[in-house]
Design a protein with these regions (language model features):
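Short hydrophobic beta-strand element within catalytic cores of glycosyltransferases
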Residues: 38-39, 287-290
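Glycosyltransferase donor-sugar binding loop
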Residues: 38-43, 192, 217-231
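A short, active-site helix/loop in glycosyltransferases that binds the activated sugar's phosphate group
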Residues: 131-156, 164-166
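A conserved, positively charged/aromatic
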Residues: 30, 105-136
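N-terminal strand-loop element at the rim of the active site
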Residues: 8-66, 146, 155-156
């Protein structure tokens, strides 16, 4: 199988699981062959990839032909064989660039979002006709793609779960974070993700307000997407009288080190497509509690390697209380989760599967 020139493409302004997966693909693939990356300048992903050789394209939602022309020229100049894009809003730019280029590269999309409606209009049929492969991050996403995209234009759909890797976090680093947040012997409940309503931080705050008598603190990790929502969270903390139990860390690149603080990690999103944070917690030997829908259903076996809840604060409070009272159960679930993450979601194995798909196009 000959080496191919790959291009990772993402103009998203954010830095969440999707964008971190872009960075992980680029950092891994470039060690195994020719791989370049195109990002939007001065956005969070650009800053996260500090010191890397990046190609810059500004998104233009009113005149998409402008970034598409720039991308087409880059494709031809760099002899790109495969364009791998991730953000759904990039689909028009990438497809138009393929049409405008002389090289006519293969296109693969990593689909990180659910699909909920039929794509049978002329525009979407044209888009999908020009995409060669879609990488679905779960079997649920694969089923949705094959249901909603007309069969005569539906690209080949391949399922490869996302992966994560175990980092060597020194105890000294963990202790420094404990000191920073004034943590001692508390039971730590963590939630990692962008500060926006859909991530469900408010559910965790409400759940903890029902457990005031317990020695619990909550560490909320993530950068703010919605300032009004952040202020509403802080007001809820005051109204529920749990100011002494809630810590907002803000954005950090040291997510794994922060997870080492946790006894339990929560995913409270209503319809998480995959849940990268779930496997990140598992590989850090942190017990997971996640909503019983979407991607977590393909990751967690309830009561075996984690717990699922119905996204009510009452049910979450019960699950947290159960693990607080039963250290043996908590540690057993965490260990089983760790073993599953190493076996089924190890980054190098998952990246290799995806890379082989790209090379085979």
């Amino acid at each position: 199988m000959r080496n191919k020139n790959l291009l990772e493409f993402c103009l998203s302004p954010d830095l969440g699981g999707l964008e971190l997966f872009v960075a992980n693909c680029f950092n891994d693939f470039r060690t195994k062959g020719s791989c370049k990356i195109a990002v939007a300048p001065d956005k969070k992903l650009d800053n996260y990839l500090e010191g890397k050789d990046k190609f810059y394209i500004k998104r233009n939602k009113f005149f998409p032909i402008i970034p598409a022309l720039k991308l087409a020229r880059f494709i031809d100049k760099s002899d790109i064989d495969v364009v791998h894009f991730h953000w759904t809003k990039d689909i028009g730019t990438v497809v138009l660039a393929k049409v405008l280029s002389k090289k006519k590269p293969k296109i693969i999309q990593t689909r990180n979002m659910t699909m909920t409606r039929f794509k049978d209009d002329f525009y979407h049929k044209w888009l999908y006709k020009n995409i060669d492969t879609i990488h679905a991050v779960t079997y649920q996403v694969k089923e949705q793609l094959e249901r909603f995209i007309p069969k005569d234009v539906c690209p080949k759909v391949e399922v490869v779960y996302m992966g994560t890797k175990e980092l060597d976090i020194k105890q000294q680093k963990v202790q420094s974070l404990k000191d920073k947040y004034n943590l001692t012997d508390e039971f730590i409940v963590g939630i990692v993700g962008r500060i926006e309503e859909g991530k469900g931080q408010w559910i965790v705050i409400e759940a903890i307000s029902m457990l005031k008598e317990l020695n619990i603190k909550v560490v909320i990790v993530g950068h703010t997407m919605d300032e009004n929502y952040l202020e509403s969270l802080k007001q809820k903390v005051k109204d529920l009288g749990v100011e002494d139990k809630i810590i907002f860390t803000g954005f950090t690149k040291e997510v794994d080190a922060h997870m080492k603080l946790f006894d339990v990690n929560i995913l409270a999103t209503p319809k998480e497509t995959f849940g990268l944070v779930v496997i990140e917690a598992m590989v850090n030997k942190v017990c997971m509690i996640a909503t019983n829908s979407g991607g977590p259903l393909e990751i967690i076996e309830d009561g075996v390697d984690g717990l699922l809840f119905d996204r009510s604060s009452e049910d979450l409070a019960e699950k947290i209380k159960l693990l607080y009272a039963n250290k043996t159960l908590k540690e057993s679930l965490a260990l089983s989760g760790y073993e599953k993450a190493k076996e089924k979601f190890e980054a190098s194995k998952q990246n290799e599967k995806l890379l082989n798909i790209l090379k085979g196009m």
